[in-house]
Amino acid sequence: MKSLPLFVCVLVLAGGCTARQRDHFYVLDAQPAGSNESRTQFERQITLRVTVPSLIDRGEMVLTTSSGVMVLDHERWATPLADLVTATLGQDIERRRGDVVVLPKSADQAGIPLVKMVIEIDQVTARLGDKVAIETHWRVTDARTGKVSIGRDVFASPQRPQSYADVASGLSTCIALLAERLVREVPAP
């Protein structure tokens, strides 16, 4: 009889060790939604370099709280956040300007004008029930003319996320708003 309570205790402890919260993975979506058609002809190439704050450039989703930040162990980005932002921003730019291709580095094609974009996301504010926002600054250089455009702005999504998937969607919206602003800096062909 003495072993029955001990056996129950061992079962409870073992059950606690095997019970585990599942991880959820999120991605950013290019906007507007639709297919990104493969193109072989383009008038301009854009090289894109994006940095995000080291605090949020991690596998786990990070939310803003009133006293700091909260790292969510089981709400995760599918790939490093800097890679997600770079890929999504590139797709967003290409969807807005059909005459450009966004590449991680120059294609070294003589005669195809090159524009270099360096984007630094200074702060990401994401909180359930509040708008998602990014504060960013950028430098856009037309390699042919040497013209440099420098800018800084805050982009906020209109929706107020009620779930972690909504946070990812809100961040996608912020990236799309940034792309909308950046394409104005790309010279016409």
Task: Give each language-model segment a name.
Residues 18-29, 36-37, 159-189:
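C-terminal/domain-edge helix-coil "capping" segments
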Residues 18-35, 96-144, 159-161:
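Surface-exposed short loop/turn segments
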Residues 70-101:
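Mid-chain, structured segments of secreted extracytoplasmic proteins
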